[in-house]
Structures are given as C-alpha cells and as structure tokens.
Amino acid sequence: MTAGPAAASAPAGPAAASGSAAAPEPTRPVPAPDERSAPYWAAAARHVLTVARCARCSTYVVPPDHTCPHCGSTDPGFAFEPVSGRGTVRSWTVVRQSFLPGFRGEVPFLLVDVELAEQPELRVIGRLLDGPDTTLRIGAPVAVAFEDVADGVSVPAFALAEPSATGPGEVRS
C-alpha cells in the first residue's frame, strides 16, 4: 500500500496573482538507518516487517539495545527476523496537528499501538492507513501494510484486517 504527501493547494495572495510558483510541499521525513537498524529498513523497503530477536533467549525486542531486557545478556546478538505483521490494537491516538512540515498536508491521521501476534507485549506503533474516521476498538485485528515514502524507502504501517463489528469497547475517533 502506498501513500504520499497530499497535493499542495493553490497559493493565495500576490504570488498566485503574479504567476510565481508556489514553494514545493515539504516531503515527509525518511529514516536514517544506522549500523544497528539498517537490516530493519532494508527489509521494510521490500515490504517485509522484521523484529530484532535475542540470540540468547529468543525473545523479540523493539527496539534492540545493547542489553536484552528479557534475559539481561550484554551480548544479545540481535538479528532481525521476519514476523507475520498480524496483531491487535492496544491503543491509538488521532494526530490532528503536525509540527513536522512533511506531515502538515496529511493530518488528521491515526497512530496505533499494536501488539504483534508473535509474542505477548511485543508492541510497535504505526500509522493506521484506513483513515482518521475509522471506527476502532481495543483488540481490533490489524495487519502490516507499508507506505512508500521515497524511492527505495518504505515505512511499516497498519490496516484493519477485517471490519470492526459494532460492540462493547468500540470507539469512533
């Protein structure tokens, strides 16, 4: 799934009247992979969600650090492994104002806190691509989707895996 910046509206004021070109819409920020995160971003560019896994205790960890928070190993040998991308919504928020110029044309949007199916409390945050007026509930099933934000750069996001049924705990954003 792809998404890009919203088209800039026509400028108002003297510049529009004189025919001057409007300033280009700022682009979204893109990841700047470092040595530790490069495998994650390379997989994301192929639309594959990966999570770091400790070589000592096999626990998935987001984000990987110098020490495994589960077993305490100071030499966790984290390796990024593909995961299903399936999970459930644990929480969400509606972003209505962006302080980053590259997102100004895209508000409002939903950010979801997702618990991945691979492990209890394995949580990641991403944009929900179903739109800001989507009806959500805690426990709603989601699946990974990807936003192609630049050539060769994709960012993991989520989409509802099935329509939310009306019922207890359902909230309209």
Q: Model-derived features: where do they sit?
A:
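A broadly conserved sequence feature marking short terminus-proximal activation segments
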Residues: 1-51, 159-161
